[in-house]
Amino acid sequence: NNCGGCGFPGCDGLAAAIAAGTAPVNGCPVGGAPVGEKIAAIMGVEAGSTEKKVAFVKCKGTCDKATVKYNYYGIDDCHKIADAVPGGGSKGCNYGCLGSGSCVKACPFDSIHVVDGVACVNPLTCKACGKCVEACPKHLIELIPYDTKHVVKCSSKDKGKDVMKACSVGCIGCHLCEKNCPSDAVHVVDNVAYIDQEKCTGCGICAEKCPKKIIL
């Protein structure tokens, strides 16, 4: 597919690196473990473990949840909007998804679409190539383990009162998730909750306690 998710300039580049012994046989994020195992068999080496990942958008500010500062009519390019449009976009939240679909255009697998103003990933078809991650000027998209138990769907670093003015479902940094987590896996950093997946046991208490229901 030549998506470049492996870090090389296309499939040929990765293949050459594998043959030269400078890249792992399981280096293709799209092919995943099955392809890695086949290449390993051909090369006569161990495939090693491959953790399946999926793209995740850290924003829940849909059209009915996020406020707008003005109506925007212009080019659908998130980078140009972030760089040139007043306030970095029309949404009240300066950290939210711009909804213009640069990630959609970048995805070679048709796995991401803008729904109600926010990019949404289909985890069943996402190949974790990372193209959408590179395409987002707000740095809202990251690759997470496919079996991640709980995630925070917000990226705002504004204080709670400012978040409430901009989005009805934004993290307000109330610390309820942090205070109630029995595994010390959740912490509020820069006014937004973060979950340490190494410590998270999937108990779901943080999601239950979140008043904004942005922990999924």
Name each region found by the language model.
Residues 119, 192-193:
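Hydrophobic residues embedded in beta-strands of well-ordered beta-sheets
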Residues 1-180, 184-187, 207-209, 213-216:
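Ferredoxin-type iron-sulfur electron-transfer modules and their immediate structural context
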